Amino acid sequence: MKRSTGGTQPKGLNVKRSKLADARFIEVESPALSNGAVDLKKFIESRSFEITALQDAMKRSKESSAQRAFQALPRCLRRRAASHNIKRIPKGLRDRALYEMQLSSSSTLPIAPSRQRLKRFIKRLRRKLAKSGETKAIDSTGSLVTDNSTDDSRIPSLAAVKLIRGKFAGRQLRKVWLPTHLWVCKRAHMINAWGYAIPEKPTEKSYRPTHRAAFRKDAIAFDMSYEPLFCISGPYEALKEKFGNSFANGLPPVFLNSSRSFTSYLVKSDIHELICPCFLQWNNPTEDDKKQIPVKNPTECVQLVIRLHPSAFLQAWNYLSGIAVLDDRIAMHDWRLDLASFDIHGPDSNIMLHKVFDDVELDEAGKVWQSISNYSSACLPMGASISVKALVNTRCDKNLSEKGEKSLLDSAENSLPASANQYSTHFRYWERQEIPSFAVFENKNRHTHEKKSSEKEVIPVYITYRKEWNGLTVILPWDYAKFVWRKMMYQKGIRFGGLENLHQIAFEKRMPFFPIDYPDTISGQLCEEERKKRNEDSWKRRPPAKRVNYQKFGDNFSEIGNPFCCDWVYLNEMVKASRDEDKTLQLVRVQVQLVQRGSLQDRARIYCLSDDELSKWKTIIYKENLTAENLLYPKCPNETAIIGFVTTGNFNLNAGKPSGIANVLAKTIKNEKSGYCIIRNVGCSVPRLAQWKFNQSH
């Protein structure tokens, strides 16, 4: 029923516009001139009237706005469900929100303090304190099953979960909270994976903002503390001899004698099985740390620091420890839950990180760190690593926008290099021929760091540039990570992301994302099983009339293999049934991109093309310019032509067209670096011509 309008109020879309125009109308008076002469009395009255009219128009314009205080907030701070609670609004807008609540006709009133409520709270608190003294501490949290633990702690056994005491200890018995959990869990969707509570994606819309932060301007930060850190200690010659074949590119000495990190693939050299990609860094421990390493001749030891994906950690640890246990010169150290790590991606990641670590000790590394404060991330040398001692505020109630106490920096020494010669001089820091030493890998406990005051402590921080991500990786002690993260999130121009956002950035950079795009690994197979179950459950929850019938769609077309996953089992059986001599399922990761318009989705089927079929497709596309509805549009090849699946497919905002990461049979592409194929989405009978490209760097 329409709402009746009283009087002769105009109808249409211009009602609101006319009201706003009337509210902003300012009345004026005549110049008060008589025969060219100024009448002083009338002139003052006219100007007084105009000033009053201006003030009245400003007031009416302000009151005519339909925007409330909570609506004036940026999207990331809006709490529409709790807009009646002024405590959910920043302090600068609370007075305005309280005033609007009092003027409104609703019965919502600000909550008045209650003495009875306070008494009940104190009583409950006393009961909890009395009960906490009677509870027993948790003695053990179990251990992971490892194959090669030794009694002399050279190869230690692994703890399943870090021992936690406190208010939320019961929630962390079967999973580990990241150091930023209390901040992130209010702002992101959380998932339990690989024994950790990990943010999946922010609660606000983040697909396009993630693209802008990672590729256009600003930066995006990820808490990567769930990726385990551990190291292998021993003489370099022993490590190169035992583990040289376990990494795809070996252990070249060029990275040993320079402050640079590098990435590689961990493989089982005896059976040529890929385990996972990994991040590597050489470290020269101090003499005191060398004495504590339980190996023969500890003074000759160097450390190979490794960071990899948590889904492959146990497999990698068992494989590497199986090699290390045979040589008493080699030891392994588990640094999980002792060291936290952040990844900051984007063109301004270096500038943002300098705003966080703006107060460092001015040793040689500290001066180099300050000299590159205004450089873009792309200007840094590939794999450049540096260790600084930063002053961290450990008080959460301080205003992080203020400088606080006097900085450790001298303003004269904190200036940027004035010439290109000074620029190159500072960058020679990463060309020195010596084994680097990083303090963060030595003192990992919180109470061993120097205290400058009751609020600030000096902690070691490791920072390295990752060229493939165009960002920086930060490693720091676990207990200080929450303070650094909080300061980082209060910087203008930086946002946080979750697992889905990290996958999106890798996809737009056309990089395979582990473990989703690695079906030839054990972790990738387990991940595909989880995705299959999730897709099938989502399909079953939909009503029959609203879900795709994979048994019959299009022109009597039925889906090939399991429609809820990339069915590698089906492809493997098809390879075994073929007449080829090589009946092994060897996969190669390639990039795919549609030639024409269309959509590209996960689990899409890839078909090979003969030369005759390719010429027919090119004739139709480039000459006749026909659409998919045309009768001359080629039909989809039969099931024997399937050569792979698209593991990640979507619209690529960086490329401006649909693209994807796919895995195809190695024998079908031979030695070619690019070619054409046919791609068909799951539940769709229309094929699309696509171009694949082999990327050797990934």
From Swiss-Prot:
GO terms for cellular component: nucleolar ribonuclease P complex; nucleolus; nucleus; ribonuclease MRP complex; ribonuclease P complex. GO terms for molecular function: ribonuclease P activity; tRNA binding. It holds the Pfam family POPLD. It is found in: Nucleus, Nucleolus. Its EC number is 3.1.26.5. Keywords: Hydrolase, Nucleus, rRNA processing, tRNA processing. It catalyses: Endonucleolytic cleavage of RNA, removing 5'-extranucleotides from tRNA precursor. GO terms for biological process: endonucleolytic cleavage in ITS1 to separate SSU-rRNA from 5.8S rRNA and LSU-rRNA from tricistronic rRNA transcript (SSU-rRNA, 5.8S rRNA, LSU-rRNA); tRNA 5'-leader removal; tRNA processing. InterPro entries: Pop1, POP1_C, Pop1_N, POPLD_dom. Required for processing of 5.8S rRNA (short form) at site A3 and for 5' and 3' processing of pre-tRNA. Belongs to the POP1 family. Component of nuclear RNase P and RNase MRP complexes. This is Ribonucleases P/MRP protein subunit pop1. It comes from Schizosaccharomyces pombe (strain 972 / ATCC 24843) (Fission yeast).
